[in-house]
Amino acid sequence: LGTPNEELTWSTWRNPRNIYMSFNDNNKSMMVSGIYEYTARNFYVTFIKAKKTTNEEDLIFLEEEYNKEETKETNKYTGKYKDNNLIIVQLEGIDNWLITEEDTPTLYKMMNNGINFTNHYSYYNGGGSTFNSEFAVNTGFITPLSYTQNAYTFNKNTFPYSLAHLFKNEGYTVNAFHMNTSEYYSRGVNYKNWGYDNYYGLVDLGTYKDDSYVLDRELILNETFKEKMFENEKFVNYIITYTNHMPFTTEKGNCRKLLKLDYLSENNLEELPKDYVYPEMTEESCARRQAKETDYMMELLLNELTERNLLDNTTIVVFTDHYLYTLSDQTILDKYKETDNNLINHTPFFIWHNNKDKKTIKEVTSQLNVLPTILNLYGIDYTSNYYIGTDALDNNYHGSVFFSDYSWYDGSIYVDGGVVTKGKEIDSLLLEDKNYYINYLIKKNDLTLKYNYFKQIKERQNKTI
């Protein structure tokens, strides 16, 4: 397998040794290890690998942290969308440069007529970055940085303050919709643990005679999904798209499938001519065509809400799971993004309410801000200290984002290895304070998950009732 990349690089996720050691991604882990080694290592990681021992200093830190006084305040956005339906759309690989008026007109219009967080960053954690975003947005925490544990293995942890639990307390039904099965990333188990009523996978329906379920349009066109999405009066729907997934080639995958559909539609045919030859397309062109399919799904969603007279009382939150790191040709990213540091993780995030609230937020945000921002907008009472991120619409919000190699960015400076590598130098004491704060957030995140601390908090609360 070779040697691992000790530092995060653009291609770390491809390194066989990194894949094997992290064991974060089912598919890639199987590819590098083979079925027998995969089975053995999966058993070891899940059941045998030594668990972390209890450290008294860790517990004291958590005790002090979670006994701090509440500091959040109301603002002009508090309760703005109270009692609205909520649809969260997690976009697969829709990088910033893919949202254009030409390629993705629906997303482009929504983004520019909503609350647009223009300095937003997703978390790159090697394989499994899609589920890492699901984990962050639903729980307010991210995959640990100081030790290796897959996000989807925290299904035995208690998350009483997750998005689903808090919205269900307000009388909402909460469901998730995706292409893939409930077994993949143990989504069925995890979503139930987070408080969801159901996780629905198109593949699980068992009604498809082909693989057309990989097209995002099916998330809305499928009659069963459509019925489940809108059958209740107050609902939260978490929709995870798929079509803009690798590979980006006309030789196989979703790009090839879409080109076939385009040709059949344009020529009013049911089958391709025997002499048909697929055109050659660059990875970028395929990515744009696949993104257009996701945009078509969004168009169908808005049409469905309009037909059901739900558009005015439904808020849609949209963000991307990760930048398009699955491209083979990095020069594509070099054209559109900063690629020599973790700012490559810059991705879209916006909140749309039928073109009624247009605002640009330039402060730095990340997936960790999504949940507390939603809770405030819906006027749902929550304890701000129970999350790593804070409400990005708060009057006193000054954001920063940290990455898996402990580098961080606050909108003015990018710090790597404790020193400023981008932006103007700042006072050494201020830099020391900021470095300390980032490490404190990571420590809080990792220890809370390690010790399943919310289970202890909930047990104490139940004893006082």
Task: Give a label for each model feature.
Residues 20-33, 51, 156, 212, ...:
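Alpha-helix initiation/capping motif
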Residues 29-79:
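N-terminal, intrinsically disordered, polar/charged segments of Gram-positive cell-envelope systems
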Residues 1-42, 105:
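Transmembrane and membrane-interface helices of multi-pass
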Residues 60-465:
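Solvent-exposed soluble domains appended to multi-pass membrane proteins
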